[in-house]
């Protein structure tokens, strides 16, 4: 069983991520993880923090000479700003009082759309600092690091590869008639400031981001993650909590600021008649079973069906807005303007990288549940045996 967990605060000493249950023999390096984290910092409209946020990574456990050992893999991502926050975020009690100013000033004006107010109520804080430190999207760096480990496992054991791109940002839609990106388009997507292959839409999106920045506002959008090479039969229909589409939806909704998910054509399917909503089954020129379309997004009955898996997520505009919204100061009970933490005009392109990491982790878990194996070689043999058990025309 594959499990993962993250720990750490936005301005704490480090983020820590751990993944347990990974087979032995997965090739992984510190450089792989550093490169993945660099992709998370890309994207037009990112804030000032991205200019100096450098991710110093250490593989602490579970890897020897570039290969996983089958034991838990732990990763540390150091915070390069830690010296500025040593006292404010100290784990140990201080032997002196800190002035309630500067970085230690109480954050008593919760931001609408953030975890601030409800987190303060839930955990009994009179200051939003403890809430925003953990609820911050900085935590997603941990998940991107774990997602890189999952990427290597999926590719080496199953030949599964993924790619993510932006399909809408700030109300600007990319052209739906363009071919879907493939993993071979990764370099071109990384080169795009808004992670799209649609150059016309790219220019209009950049213009919208510039407008939002001038207006001290923020923008949301829609991302899509595609998974290629996923064999049929991952996930199951027998219990609702083991359905692959349910797990993918949960993984995307667990990313900060995401408010909607669809698999395949998703909500469009609700407006179509049944005769136009499903993917007809045919025998292709090679004598094998095939489909005429992929409206289901590669998942039917909670199981992968062998087609490309398509998952979309809708991200709301970042609620840390320079043009601060109305709130209430919880210390005085009076109306006030919300605190304005350093933020981005949009983080949709970067969020696509996070979403891709979560899809990878979910697919890795469900693929391992299906095929098992204590080593990559054993997992690969199990996959080959499974595929060989099908009649020739069903492969």
Curated annotation (Swiss-Prot):
Record's keyword annotation contains Cytoplasm: no
Binding residue positions for NADP(+): 40, 46
Cellular-component GO terms for this entry: cytosol
GO BP annotation list: amino acid biosynthetic process; aromatic amino acid family biosynthetic process; chorismate biosynthetic process
UniProt keyword Repeat, yes or no: no
Keyword annotations from UniProtKB, A to Z: Amino-acid biosynthesis, Aromatic amino acid biosynthesis, FAD, Flavoprotein, FMN, Lyase, NADP
Reactions mediated catalytically: 5-O-(1-carboxyvinyl)-3-phosphoshikimate = chorismate + phosphate
Binding site for FMN: 134-136, 256-257, 301, 316-320, 342
Pfam family, one: Chorismate_synt
Note describing how the cofactor binds: Reduced FMN (FMNH(2)).
Top-tier EC class: lyase
Cofactors required: FMNH2
Annotated InterPro entries: Chorismate_synth (IPR000453), Chorismate_synth_AroC_sf (IPR035904), Chorismate_synthase_CS (IPR020541)
Region (Disordered): 99-120
Cited NCBIfam families: aroC, PRK05382.1
Family that this chain belongs to: Belongs to the chorismate synthase family.
Role of this protein: This reaction introduces a second double bond into the aromatic ring system.
Protein name: Chorismate synthase
Species of the source: Bifidobacterium longum (strain NCC 2705)
Gene that this sequence comes from: aroC
């Amino acid at each position: 069983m594959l499990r993962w967990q993250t720990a750490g605060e936005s301005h704490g000493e480090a983020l820590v991520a751990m993944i347990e249950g990974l087979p032995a023999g997965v090739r992984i390096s510190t450089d792989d993880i550093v490169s993945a984290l660099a992709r998370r910092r890309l994207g037009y409209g990112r804030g000032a923090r991205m200019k100096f946020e450098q991710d110093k990574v250490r593989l602490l456990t579970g890897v020897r000479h570039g290969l996983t050992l089958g034991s838990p893999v732990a990763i540390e991502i150091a915070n390069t700003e830690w010296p500025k926050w040593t006292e404010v975020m100290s784990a140990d009690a201080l032997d002196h009082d800190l002035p309630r100013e500067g970085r230690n000033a109480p954050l008593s004006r919760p931001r609408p759309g953030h975890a601030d107010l409800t987190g303060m109520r839930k955990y009994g804080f009179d200051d939003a600092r403890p809430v925003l430190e953990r609820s911050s999207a900085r935590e997603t760096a941990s998940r991107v690091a774990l997602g890189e480990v999952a990427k290597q496992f999926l590719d080496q054991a199953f030949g599964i590869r993924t790619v993510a791109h932006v399909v809408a940002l700030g109300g600007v839609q990319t052209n739906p008639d363009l071919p879907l990106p493939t993993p071979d388009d990764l370099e071109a997507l990384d080169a795009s400031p808004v992670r799209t292959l649609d150059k016309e839409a790219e220019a209009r999106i950049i213009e919208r981001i510039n407008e939002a920045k001038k207006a001290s506002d923020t923008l949301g959008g829609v991302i899509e993650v595609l998974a290629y090479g996923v064999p049929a039969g991952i996930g199951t229909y027998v219990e609702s909590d083991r359905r692959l589409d349910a797990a993918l939806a949960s993984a995307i909704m667990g990313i900060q600021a995401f408010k909607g998910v669809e698999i395949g054509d998703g909500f469009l399917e609700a407006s179509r008649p049944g005769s136009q909503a499903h993917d007809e089954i045919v025998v292709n020129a090679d004598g094998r079973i095939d489909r005429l379309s992929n409206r289901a997004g590669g998942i039917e009955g909670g199981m992968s069906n062998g087609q490309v898996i398509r998952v979309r997520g809708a991200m709301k505009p970042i609620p840390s807005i320079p043009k601060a919204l109305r709130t209430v100061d919880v210390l005085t009970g009076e109306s006030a303007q919300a605190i304005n933490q350093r933020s981005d005009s949009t983080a949709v392109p970067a969020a696509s990288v996070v979403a891709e990491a979560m899809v990878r982790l979910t697919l890795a878990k469900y693929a391992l549940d299906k095929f098992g194996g204590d080593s990559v070689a054993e997992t690969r043999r199990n996959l080959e045996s499974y595929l060989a058990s099908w009649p020739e025309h069903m492969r």
